[in-house]
Amino acid sequence: MNPEKDFAPLTPNIVRALNDKLYEKRKVAALEIEKLVREFVAQNNTVQIKHVIQTLSQEFALSQHPHSRKGGLIGLAACSIALGKDSGLYLKELIEPVLTCFNDADSRLRYYACEALYNIVKVARGAVLPHFNVLFDGLSKLAADPDPNVKSGSELLDRLLKDIVTESNKFDLVGFIPLLRERIYSNNQYARQFIISWILVLESVPDINLLDYLPEILDGLFQILGDNGKEIRKMCEVVLGEFLKETKKSPSSVKFAEMANILVIHCQTTDDLIQLTAMCWLREFIQLAGRVMLPYSSGILTAVLPCLAYDDRKRNIKEVASVCNQSLMKLVTPEDDEPDEPRPVVQKQAGPSPEDCAAKQEGAASGGPDGSCDSSFSSGISVFTPASAERAPVTLHLDGIVQVLNCHLSDTAIGMMTRIAVLKWLYHLYIKTPRKMSRHTDSLFPVLLQTLSDESDEVILKDLEVLAEIASSPAGQTDDPGPLDGPDLRVSHSELQAPIPGRAGLLNTPGTKGLECSPSTPTMNSYFYKFMINLLKRFSSERKLLEVRGAFIIRQLCLLLHAESIFHSMADILLREEDLTFASTMVHTLNTILLTSTELFQLRNQLKDLKTPESRNLFCCLYRSWCHKPVTTVSLCFLTQNYRHAYDLIQKFGDLEVTVDFLTEVDKLVQLIECPIFTYLRLQLLDVKSNPYLIKALYGLLMLLPQSSAFQLLSHRLQCVPNPELLQTEDGLKAAPKSQKADSPSIDYAELLQHFERVQKKHLEVRHQRSGRGDHLDRRVVL
């Protein structure tokens, strides 16, 4: 510094002392400056006051010499003390050079800057608020200062500034928020602590409504919640908890929509605390905002669905996610199936909603995951409409939702509970919005069919519920069930088509009586037939599925849909099956289900009497496919009391190739005759004269069997058939002989028998072709 330079009104002694390396001498100079400035204040000499401040700022505080800078800082503090209440007029000039020194490399100088600014602020009090942003910016940097003395000094200044803000009603929150939003993303532990402490202070001031600006800082708060320091995490939890309480107190002023995606992001983090807190916030948002959250459904489901498969280690997160999922599902109503004209949000007045937590973006937790997150979920969702969203149109856009559900269902690595939740969502959407969902059925159908191979029975049950709803929904009704097949109506698996009402079945000739396909059931739509076709294709390509789960799947479908339609359509489709081995296996499975399942009691009764055209039509349809298995065909005739035709069929068995499998099936049929299902048949043995063909058919089976346990069983049963003369009563002698049950005139049994012969001939040809290929291969090996 040039000693000859004029620093008036500062005296040479003051200048010399300010530049001294000793603190005591600089302090003496500061007292002289204070005295000098007081005189200028008394004289109202603002020109000289400004000159003194400018000199101390430019020539000392911003000097290149460290001792000069220290002198300038203490001098500026002295000016502020001397100015007293008038210091507010000169705050910009007083504060700026001091803040510049906050960045000094010398830690002692940074400490003196803190001390100087403390004195300036202490004198000015509320007058410093217009300069709050620059003060906050400087303090936020010092909060992370490595020097403990500097940090201690900054904490004193920080407390003073907080006191001033708390007692003032002139704080410029609007101007401060951009700075807070920027600083909140600091990764420094101390800077984060500083930020959180200020948010806590601002939240506690009644005149400051920080909730309006929560969307600006919520993401940053969740970032801080993931800090490694326990103390900082706890502070952040407290802050988020306070915000959540305010949200529940004043939901009408909360900008739910602006924060929804923030929560969705943090619900997907790997940090348990962040995820739990974000999930708790999301739960409260869904319950408080109601349909306002619907546009964010796809994101919410992306975050929530994987959590439903968590184990007990993350039970809290799983429970809260489950409530979120249920609450969101309840927001979808039948009105959402109307044309895409946005509906205004309905505002409900509601009582206090259950206590909970908050969260967002990468992390998860805050708002007290301990107690508040465990609150019970009330069945009635309290819905408040935010002021900003009042009367705002809310339309349910299914594209994103269905895409998320489809993605999760297609992911084989996803947990069972998540898959079940996805299927529940799909079922709910098909129930509430069938018209809109029908547009997505083509994309969903393949993955729903694939899900039938799931390892979990519960998943398969839910999957079948969805498929059944698709198959029976009026929204999927079309007039064209599919293209016709070729002249013989036989196609490969990849070309299976839906049966066409009125068209003849496999090997059927024009004009054949009783062999027409029955009309489709009115309650079923085109997807029903597509479902049946693809289900059989799946059974054909995955024989393990048919073996392990086939009966289970078909029985459940009979409960969910119309059993007659299922058997009718499958029988029609099997007529077009080229793989005769699969057709035989499938017929055997269907016959076993028909004869043994309690779910089909009503259908068995319908077939037993053949009193209606529908039942006779069904019998003919089943018969044509049942012909793939001779013994099952006989069992169908027994079920429908067509004993004469059963006897005629058994007579044809002499022309068939009798194999071990064939005899095993006869054995099983004999065992089945002894079951409760055929109680009526056994009772009819008492009326020998009316049922001669039943007895002849049973004797025919007996003659087919070798001397086995089944032979003994049936033989003993037939031995119990009474002598008709012994049963003759006096009234019976007078009465005309009772004829057996008359064959239905609408069924051409001769044609049915011819059909049976044709099918069996086809089976024989296929077996011979296979054996021929086998012999040819054997000869090649020998050669």
UniProtKB/Swiss-Prot annotation:
Which top-rank group of organisms is this from?
Eukaryota
Q: Where are the HEAT repeats?
A: 5-42, 89-126, 171-208, 212-249, 439-476, 561-599
Protein localization: Endosome membrane; Microsome membrane
> By what name is this protein known?
Protein VAC14 homolog
InterPro entries of this UniProt entry? ARM-like, ARM-type_fold, Vac14, VAC14_Fig4p-bd
Q: Name one GO biological process term.
A: phosphatidylinositol biosynthetic process
The protein's role, per its UniProt record: Scaffold protein component of the PI(3,5)P2 regulatory complex which regulates both the synthesis and turnover of phosphatidylinositol 3,5-bisphosphate (PtdIns(3,5)P2). Pentamerizes into a star-shaped structure and nucleates the assembly of the complex. The pentamer binds a single copy each of PIKFYVE and FIG4 and coordinates both PIKfyve kinase activity and FIG4 phosphatase activity, being required to maintain normal levels of phosphatidylinositol 3-phosphate (PtdIns(3)P) and phosphatidylinositol 5-phosphate (PtdIns(5)P).
Q: Which family does it belong to?
A: Belongs to the VAC14 family.
Q: Which UniProt keywords apply?
A: Acetylation, Endoplasmic reticulum, Endosome, Membrane, Microsome, Phosphoprotein, Repeat
- List modified residues, type Phosphothreonine: T11
Pfam families in alphabetical order: Vac14_Fab1_bd, Vac14_Fig4_bd
Instruction: Give the species this sequence originates from.
Output: Bos taurus
Where are the N-acetylmethionine modifications? M1
Q: Per the record, which residues fall in region Mediates interaction with the PDZ domain of NOS1?
A: 774-778
Tell me the SUPFAM superfamilies matching this sequence: ARM repeat
Entry's free-text remark on domains:
The C-terminal domain (residues 523-782) mediates pentameric interactions and is necessary for the formation and maintenance of the PI(3,5)P2 regulatory complex.
The record's section on Gene3D superfamilies has: Leucine-rich Repeat Variant (1.25.10.10)
Q: Give residues where Phosphoserine occurs.
A: S518, S744
Q: How does it assemble?
A: Forms pentamers. Component of the PI(3,5)P2 regulatory complex/PAS complex, at least composed of PIKFYVE, FIG4 and VAC14. VAC14 nucleates the assembly of the complex and serves as a scaffold by pentamerizing into a star-shaped structure, which can bind a single copy each of PIKFYVE and FIG4 and coordinates their activities. Interacts with NOS1.
Q: Which GO terms describe its cellular component?
A: endoplasmic reticulum; endosome membrane; PAS complex
